[in-house]
From Swiss-Prot:
UniProt biased composition (Basic and acidic residues): 476-494
A cellular component term, taken from the record's GO annotations: plasma membrane
Biological processes per GO annotation: neuron projection development
Complex and partners: May interact with GNAO1.
Name assigned to this protein: GRIN2-like protein
Region spans: Disordered: 1-23, 467-500
Physiological role: May be involved in neurite outgrowth.
Highest taxon above the source species: Eukaryota
Pfam families in alphabetical order: GRIN_C
InterPro entries: GPRIN2-like/GPRIN3, GRIN_C
Amino acid sequence: MGLESVVQTMNNQSPDNNSQSRTKTTNHFLIIEQSPASWEVGDTKMCVKSSTVENVSSACFKHQQSMGKMDEPRAVLQRSHSDLTCSCKQQSYVTHVETSATDSSLSSSSSRHGPSVVRMSFQTERYGSGIRNKENTSHYQNLVTHLPALPIDQKVPTNTFDSGGIPHNTTVYTDPGRFHSAVLGPHMPGNGFSNRTMLSQATGIIHGGLTYSNIPNSAFSPMAMTVHNSSAVPCNIRQDSCMKVDATIPAYCHSLPIPSIQLVPRLVCSVSESGKEQAAPDYFHSFSTSDILTYPKLVSSVSESGLDAKRVLKCCSIPGEQLQHAQRCTQQERASSETQTACVAFSSQQTTDVAMKTKDMWTMTSANDLTKGLKPALERRDAEVQTLPTMECKSVATSPAAAAESHSHVFPEVNLEQDLEAPKSPVREVRWDDEGMTWEVYGASVDPEVLGLAIQKHLEIQIEQFQTEPAQQTGKSDEDPLNKEPSSDKMEKKRPFRTMMHSLRYPSCCARSSTAVE
């Protein structure tokens, strides 16, 4: 991409050979007009305006005023996939102009409530054969570029970059109310000015010993950076001096593109992914955009987050790592004895067929990941119908408990007809006293449920006997109506029935005589 630009600069160097102290103010205007084909945005006009206030102390120099006008025909700009790189050479007059081409129109405004303004500071170094001034004189000018980006124009005095020996405070404004300050190192001895730079929504300039690095985003604006000048030699001698960038934070997910990425110069120093600072003065022409602007990888899977089963399979698939795995198992002092035993078993049986017996504790890993590299697969059993085991039935009998017959089904059989071959119920063998209480019940004194079952069956037997006896007694009473003995016999027979009903209400441990109850 070619860029047709005309640069018109008015310079006023005012060294004074008189012993008087003088103050001069020089205004610099730089107007760059661009063709519609040079930018993607369209027709743009950029006005670069700089105001320089020089306090000249008493010295013995000549007073020289020079007005230089230079035309730069077709300054070549190479555009990468995310930035525009200004190519420059040493010992030549190069002016770096960085803009942020995110808005459709770029216009300058001096009103406070008008369009928002971005101020970007950069240096121009003047020495070489193409300038009318002397080669030994170096003059650094601070140009302020007005571009629309900030909602409020923060009025901060921006002076020229001087070559004095005092430290300079540089404040880079990334958002209204948020700024980072740093201290620039000493430069060549000369006029001592205080230097402040205001920069927002654009990357810095790499020229003449001072480099602004592209530092990713703060909360609202795409840049937040702190600048240090690591060059201790004069700026006109060492052009590609580097700087250190502090507190570099990688750019994380952005829903919108970053405006400052669009126009990025080649940086002098790079910041590694681990956050360590690196500074090298000879890397000016060797950096690419991929080295400068790299987004970190987003952890979106289990394998990237470290929850995969590679570490588990590591000790099982490779036999050469038996010793390392054994050492790893011995170092786990806080682990349980079962876990350590399992690890030792894995390390000792790696050459043979290993059956996986560990339990998968991760929710997003499958059995295929765990069994990858193992010869036998995990043992799998289908769901089967479980049958009840053979249980011993408790019986209220004099004989010991007998084992129940094993059945192939879960549900018990219902036999409506009485089986003749089956033995009689052992309840009949229970001894009862006169009051209806049991004196000898094998196993009944221990289990109250068995005692209740025996009492219930005993009552059923008595009820059956009472139902059969009254029929016989009624026949006898018809034959001998004067006989009153059957009535007395009935009362005596009903009395044990009442005592049995009363015994159900009170347990066997609280046995009471029937006479006391009545």
